[in-house]
């Protein structure tokens, strides 16, 4: 198991230990995850996929992770990262190889840069803002989704 997936397992344990401070869905099956990847034209890294399988979408102590989910009101459409990524492409010019995983009041969009995969299939996490001039000006906020999610969940629980 890679360090990024180990971090995701720690997020799962943290969420399970703090059920009173969090909300989550039931998780995604392989068919839903494959459909989400096809719709975006991107592949989930293993650490994000593990959390999507477990929760689908989740929120802990006010920190919302989009994930992937469907709702009856959505008419079967894939929501969360899929909807946010496709919408950001259409509305604000999000590059096609970035995947939205969170929107934050400090960083604007938190994205995975799928053009920079490592040997484990993990992508670095960046803050992306429609006003940025080029990739070099994006702020790196995590080495992988798993490590980023763990840090954010721990920070949210400590406040």
Predicted regions and their residues:
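Helix N-cap / beta->alpha transition motif
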Residues: 67, 113, 141-144
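Broad, structure-driven detector of short, well-ordered beta-strand segments within folded domains
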Residues: 108-116
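Structural motif
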Residues: 98, 123-125
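Compact, glycine/acidic-enriched structural inserts
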Residues: 127-154
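Residues in well-ordered beta-strands of folded domains
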Residues: 102, 113, 126-128
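A surface-exposed partner-binding patch
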Residues: 1-109, 153-159
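Alpha-helical interaction segments
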Residues: 37-39, 118, 138
């Amino acid at each position: 198991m890679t360090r990024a997936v180990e971090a995701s397992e720690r997020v799962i344990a943290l969420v399970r230990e703090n059920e009173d401070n969090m909300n989550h869905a039931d998780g995604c099956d392989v068919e839903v995850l494959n459909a989400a990847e096809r719709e975006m034209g991107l592949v989930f890294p293993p650490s994000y996929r593990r959390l999507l399988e477990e929760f689908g979408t989740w929120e802990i102590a006010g920190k919302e992770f989009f994930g992937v989910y469907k709702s009856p009101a959505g008419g079967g459409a894939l929501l969360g990262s899929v909807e946010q990524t496709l919408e950001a492409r259409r509305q604000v010019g999000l590059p096609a190889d970035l995947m939205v995983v969170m929107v934050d009041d400090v960083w604007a969009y938190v994205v995975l840069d799928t053009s920079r995969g490592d040997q484990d299939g993990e992508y670095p996490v960046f803050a992306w803002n429609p006003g940025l001039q080029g990739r070099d000006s994006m702020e790196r906020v995590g080495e992988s989704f798993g490590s980023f999610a763990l840090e954010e969940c721990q920070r949210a629980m400590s406040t």
